[in-house]
Amino acid sequence: MDKKVARIRRASRARHLMREQGATRLVVHRTPRHIYAQVIAPNGSEVLAAASTVEKVIKEQVQYTGNKDAAAIVGKLVAERALAKGIQVVAFDRSGFKYHGRVQVLADAAREAGLQF
């Protein structure tokens, strides 16, 4: 089993539990160059809010998009967009990534901006 398959397996177990609870999820995906965050409806078929380092708004604010500073901006922005749509409580779906580094910074920034999880 390689690293990617193991991560996907961890993610599927966590997602199954969140779907059973019927929770709105804050999903994070991380690549070496970018980080993506989406707030997904409980049914899993609708993206309610999203932010990523691919967006021009964020690229203008940071020099490099694959670091903790960029992750903090993404976390704050996705939280603001979710709160604007009336979403306050979410379940944090780290997609099998370790809760460390950029994933942790994004989560902390989203909490500081007002999301609860």
Swiss-Prot record:
Signal peptide: none annotated. Part of the 50S ribosomal subunit; part of the 5S rRNA/L5/L18/L25 subcomplex. Contacts the 5S and 23S rRNAs. The lineage of its organism: Bacteria, Pseudomonadati, Pseudomonadota, Gammaproteobacteria, Pasteurellales. This is Large ribosomal subunit protein uL18. HAMAP family: Ribosomal_uL18_B (MF_01337_B). GO terms for molecular function: 5S rRNA binding; structural constituent of ribosome. The keyword Ribosomal protein applies. Coiled coil: none annotated. CDD domains: Ribosomal_L18_L5e. PANTHER family: 39S RIBOSOMAL PROTEIN L18, MITOCHONDRIAL, LARGE RIBOSOMAL SUBUNIT PROTEIN UL18M. This is one of the proteins that bind and probably mediate the attachment of the 5S RNA into the large ribosomal subunit, where it forms part of the central protuberance. GO terms for cellular component: cytosolic large ribosomal subunit. It comes from Haemophilus ducreyi (strain 35000HP / ATCC 700724). GO terms for biological process: translation. Belongs to the universal ribosomal protein uL18 family. It holds the Pfam family Ribosomal_L18p. Keywords: Ribonucleoprotein, Ribosomal protein, RNA-binding, rRNA-binding.
